């Protein structure tokens, strides 16, 4: 009888568990440190700043009510993305909407079946730290209706091997059905032993502020195959059990263990995952507790389990191919060469403008694509000699029937203003070192001096012979045959359709597509592959520092009237110093496209380069121009890369002024000068130099030239006499400069980056984090202003072609700093096609 009575009492015991009713879906085996996705909107808001593009996810959590000890079941939708970055701080935003359907009879207090709306925000603080705030709002009736709670999140990615995540849950505690909600503190540490997502190990814990209940967990993730991850997790959870019976209520603390196994698969932009969770309950029996299912669409997913289909890439060359744009193009072409899914590349020419070395660099990268056994096709509507130079690297060249090919040769223009100055009574007075430094001749002479003319002719011969031999070889012509073809140009598409020496076909775009597919032997989609998440958080960093335009004192700026950039010495020096002092940057590439300019600014840049040499690799990649002060800046680099058509050298200096006294006299203006000091007005533009002053000026130029020569000698491992012999203002093409030891190797930016990889002991295919300097300084107000401004259709006087060309004929560094000693190319080089 006693036994039966005891059994009867046991049968009416109602067991419940005191759990925090504000939790969302359980989402087992989802980390709060390391890699983050849209689920971070509810799990650790700080992780949103580490996302790469938008993502949308749907999750469903199922549990067996018979064995459930907590909430966390239901359906959830999550959306998140990172924003900004670059000139603006990187942030992350996330949304979550969860329909919670917990085992109500198992929980105390009864949470009902609420909807939980989450809005989260994260701010990146530097590259390795992020802070987040999550806002939760409950609705749909029940004890949680209208409740608002907040979470604080922290995420740290120290490096490729270690990450940390932390949460403060329910910052603003409230009562739910008379039961206070306690704050909870979560911490998780994650280790990647191999530095990649091949293997992840993590451990974490959670403690309640009021009851002191402690949960602990561990997690392992292994990349079984590309696009397939196996996940395992074990968790020990503290439970507060409440037993209600006719004899009254009792409560006590107990524990349970949960084990989760999961499989995550990337199918490209779509990902799916499934997890199953087993439980060893407080009664020490084992049960299958439940399962979780996840589907998501991501802009930057992991590489797919199913290989990306073969495709064709389309590369458009249009607009101004300035240095930063060129970086994107050549890096992309190198990536295409290494991508096994690319079957071919179609290069579309649409009015691109760039110097010959720029075009030569792009052409070299197209040849690298061909060397990787991929077809290259060129298509143009109305091509120029510049376009054709690049297009000649292609396997097939196609021309639109409505267009033509303006193949007429190469021309350059130099301006000489002496006649105009004589007419108005202006006397240019300049001193220079040495005899090839012909920059002042545009002011002092009516035409080139014989030595300058010879130098110009030799330079043009070098450039033209390179164009001629390169294109002739590509089109299986002799240079003489190609010269005759050029001399008979330009050509219409109709003329070229009858003669396939220059093009392989004249066809409309749809017909060209058919021809390309025939050449490839199949039909392939055109377009770049989707972005893929990297297998590591950090990549070796290399700083790319641009010296773009005339070198001037102070900060970098631009002259929009003539469309010229000025490389401020102070800006470049600060960039080099910042890159040198940044411990995360392994090497520096100085990317130069400059004719020189201010002697002082050029030397300050060179000094900073020498200060960096030996601290970390510092390499130079010359683009179209790296002459005079531009060469001074490069002299201290460990290795100098240039294209054969780069224009460099011009090791020399000049200084002077314009005597306006004749003009002033013609205008009937009288000038009275007061001075204390014999040479107080020596730089005045209202009188000429005395003979004594010109001698003193030349002595100062000799001193500066000596410093220039000494720097080149030190940097290039040459004697000063050897540098002087190839200096004295002489301008060279890269092809001429290499035998003179002014250039080490032919190549472009990618070749310099390969050298950086070598010096950092990295594989040649290692992905790099390119840090571009100087940072583009645009204020938020300026960005908003550009978005809201409507351009007015007006053409200022300075935009008239004739006026613009005349103004461009004057070196920009002289326009800005007429009173500074100049280390600059002898002319404004404009090479027509």
Predicted region positions:
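Residues on the lipid-exposed face of transmembrane beta-strands in outer-membrane beta-barrel proteins
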Residues: 44, 58, 75-83, 119-123, ...
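Detector for outer-membrane/organellar transmembrane beta-barrel domains
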Residues: 146-240
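Repeated loop/turn-to-beta-strand initiation elements of outer-membrane beta-barrel proteins
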Residues: 54-58, 84-95, 126-133, 160-166, ...
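Intrinsically disordered, low-complexity segments enriched in small/flexible residues
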Residues: 244-261, 266-339, 344, 411-494, ...
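Residues that define the transmembrane beta-barrel architecture of outer-membrane proteins
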Residues: 39-41, 69-75, 111-117, 146-150, ...
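N-terminal, post-signal peptide beta-strand-biased segments of exported outer-membrane/organellar beta-barrel
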Residues: 8-90, 172
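Transmembrane beta-strands of outer-membrane beta-barrel pores
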Residues: 60-66, 97-103, 135-141, 168-175, ...
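Cleft-lining beta-strand/loop regions that shape enzyme active-site pockets
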Residues: 300-415, 538-663
């Amino acid at each position: 009888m006693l036994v039966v009575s005891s059994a009867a009492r046991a049968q009416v015991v109602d067991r419940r568990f005191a759990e925090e009713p504000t939790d969302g879906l359980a989402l087992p085996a989802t980390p709060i440190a390391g890699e983050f996705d849209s689920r971070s909107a509810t799990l650790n808001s700080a992780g949103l700043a580490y996302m790469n593009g938008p993502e949308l996810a749907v999750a469903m959590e199922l549990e067996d009510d018979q064995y459930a000890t907590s909430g966390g079941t239901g359906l959830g939708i999550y959306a998140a993305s990172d924003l900004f970055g670059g000139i603006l701080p990187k942030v992350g935003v996330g949304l979550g909407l969860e329909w919670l359907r917990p085992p109500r009879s198992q929980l105390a207090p009864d949470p009902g079946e609420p909807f939980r709306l989450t809005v989260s925000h994260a701010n990146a603080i530097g590259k390795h730290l992020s802070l987040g705030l999550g806002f939760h709002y409950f609705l749909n009736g029940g004890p949680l209706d209208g409740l608002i709670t907040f979470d604080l999140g922290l995420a740290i990615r120290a490096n490729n091997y270690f990450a940390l995540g932390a949460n403060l849950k329910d910052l603003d505690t409230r009562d739910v059905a008379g039961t206070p909600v306690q704050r909870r503190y979560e911490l998780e540490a994650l280790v990647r032993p191999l530095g990649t997502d091949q293997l992840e190990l993590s451990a974490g814990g959670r403690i309640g502020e009021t009851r002191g209940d402690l949960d602990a967990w561990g997690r392992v993730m292994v990349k079984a195959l590309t696009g397939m991850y196996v996940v395992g997790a074990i968790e020990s959870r503290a439970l507060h059990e409440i037993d209600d019976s006719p004899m009254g209520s009792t409560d006590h603390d107990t524990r349970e263990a949960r084990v989760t196994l999961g499989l995550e698969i990337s199918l490209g932009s779509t990902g799916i995952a499934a997890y199953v969770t087993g439980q060893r309950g407080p009664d020490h029996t084992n049960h299958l507790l439940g399962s979780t299912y996840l589907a998501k669409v991501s802009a930057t997913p992991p590489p797919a389990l199913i290989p990306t289909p073969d495709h064709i890439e389309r590369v458009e060359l249009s607009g101004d191919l300035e240095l930063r744009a060129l970086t994107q193009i050549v890096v992309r072409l190198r990536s295409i060469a290494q991508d096994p899914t690319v079957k071919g590349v179609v290069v579309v020419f649409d009015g691109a403008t760039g110097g010959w070395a720029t075009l030569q660099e792009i052409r070299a990268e197209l040849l690298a694509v061909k060397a990787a056994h991929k077809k290259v096709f060129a298509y143009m509507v109305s091509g120029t000699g510049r376009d054709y130079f690049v297009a000649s690297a292609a396997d097939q060249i196609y021309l639109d029937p409505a267009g033509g090919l303006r193949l007429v040769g190469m021309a350059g223009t130099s301006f000489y203003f002496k006649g105009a100055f004589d007419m108005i009574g202006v006397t240019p007075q300049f001193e220079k070192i040495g005899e090839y430094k012909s920059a002042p001749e545009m002011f002092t002479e009516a035409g080139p001096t014989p030595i300058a003319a010879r130098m110009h002719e030799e330079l043009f011969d070098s450039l033209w012979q390179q164009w001629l031999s390169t294109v002739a070889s590509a089109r299986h012509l002799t240079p003489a045959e190609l010269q005759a073809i050029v001399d008979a140009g330009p050509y219409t598409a109709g003329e070229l359709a009858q003669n396939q020496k220059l093009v392989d076909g004249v066809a409309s775009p749809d017909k060209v597509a058919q021809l390309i597919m025939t050449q490839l032997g199949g039909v392939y989609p055109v377009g770049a592959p989707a972005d893929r998440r990297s297998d590591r958080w950090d990549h070796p960093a290399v700083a790319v520092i641009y010296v773009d335009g005339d070198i001037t004192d102070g900060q970098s700026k631009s002259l929009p009237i003539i469309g010229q950039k000025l490389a401020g010495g102070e800006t470049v020096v600060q960039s080099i110093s910042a890159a040198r002092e940044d411990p995360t940057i392994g090497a520096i590439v100085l990317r130069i496209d400059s004719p020189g300019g201010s002697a002082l600014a050029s030397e300050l840049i060179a000094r900073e380069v020498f200060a960096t040499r030996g601290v970390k690799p510092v390499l130079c990649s010359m683009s179209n121009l790296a002459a005079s002060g531009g060469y001074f800046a490069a002299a201290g680099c460990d290795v100098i890369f240039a294209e054969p058509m780069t224009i460099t050298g011009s090791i020399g200096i000049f200084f002077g002024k314009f005597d306006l006294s004749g003009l002033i006299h013609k205008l009937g203006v009288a000038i009275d000068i007061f001075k204390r000091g014999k040479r107080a007005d020596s730089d005045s533009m209202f009188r000429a130099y005395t003979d004594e002053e010109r001698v003193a000026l030349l002595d100062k130029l000799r001193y500066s030239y000596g410093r220039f020569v000494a720097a080149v000698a030190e940097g290039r491992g040459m004697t000063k006499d050897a540098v002087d012999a190839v200096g004295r203002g002489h301008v060279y093409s890269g092809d001429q400069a290499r035998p003179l030891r002014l250039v080490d190797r032919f190549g472009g930016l990618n070749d310099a980056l390969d050298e950086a990889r070598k010096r950092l002991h990295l594989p040649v295919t290692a992905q790099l984090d390119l840090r571009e300097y100087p940072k583009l300084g645009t204020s938020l107000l300026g960005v908003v202003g550009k978005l809201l401004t409507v351009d007015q259709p007006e053409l200022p006087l300075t935009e008239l072609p004739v006026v613009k060309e005349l103004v461009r004929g004057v070196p920009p560094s002289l326009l800005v700093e007429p009173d500074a000693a100049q280390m600059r190319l002898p002319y404004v080089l404009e090479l027509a096609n």
